[in-house]
């Protein structure tokens, strides 16, 4: 149900925000693909943040 989805979204956000993971092209790809899911469930700020992270990484490459 809805509570379970919220739990998974929070877990995903926590993992994506982990400081010691490498911010590379793979991370950018994951952010880009996950962002719309957060938006679909109303986490619009997280969606925008993930899209921006991906853009920043792609611009550096």
Which residue stretches match the model-derived regions?
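Intrinsic-disorder-linked linear interaction elements in eukaryotic regulatory proteins
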Residues: 1-61
């Amino acid at each position: 149900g809805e509570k379970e989805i919220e739990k998974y979204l929070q877990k995903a956000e926590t993992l994506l925000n982990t400081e010691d993971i490498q911010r590379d092209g793979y991370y950018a790809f994951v952010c880009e693909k996950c962002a719309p899911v957060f938006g679909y469930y109303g986490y619009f700020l997280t969606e925008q943040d993930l899209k921006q992270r991906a853009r920043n990484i792609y611009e550096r490459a």
